Amino acid sequence: MLRQHQDSLLLRFAQGEEGHETTTQLSCLVCVDRVSHTVDIHLSDTKIAVRDSLQRRIQGGGGFHGLRIR
């Protein structure tokens, strides 16, 4: 069988394999799992994403209006 290839923005040495991944440092990445078609969102500051609705109203939305991560 063919080995399944993972497209990712991680550094090549972090994955343990060689590939065509970019080494650009990004603060926010969105990765889609090809098997289950789910989205995994990686944020540099998770405190912004997990605030409750009262904190968002007081502190501002931070550009994540309507985004729910569970």
UniProtKB/Swiss-Prot annotation:
A Pfam family annotated for this UniProt entry: DUF5431
Gene induction: Part of the flmC-flmA operon; the antisense antitoxin RNA flmB of this system overlaps the ribosome-binding site and first 3 codons of this gene on the opposite strand.
Superkingdom: Bacteria
Phenotype of null mutants: A plasmid unable to express the start codon of this protein can be lost without detriment to the bacteria, when normally the plasmid is not lost due to the Flm plasmid maintenance system.
Keyword line: Plasmid, Toxin-antitoxin system
NCBIfam families according to UniProt: PRK13720.1 (NF010277)
Role: Component of a type I toxin-antitoxin (TA) system. Either this protein or sequences upstream of it are required for translation of downstream flmA; this could be translationally coupled to flmA.
The protein's name: Protein FlmC
Organism of origin: Escherichia coli (strain K12)
Upper taxonomic lineage: Bacteria, Pseudomonadati, Pseudomonadota, Gammaproteobacteria, Enterobacterales
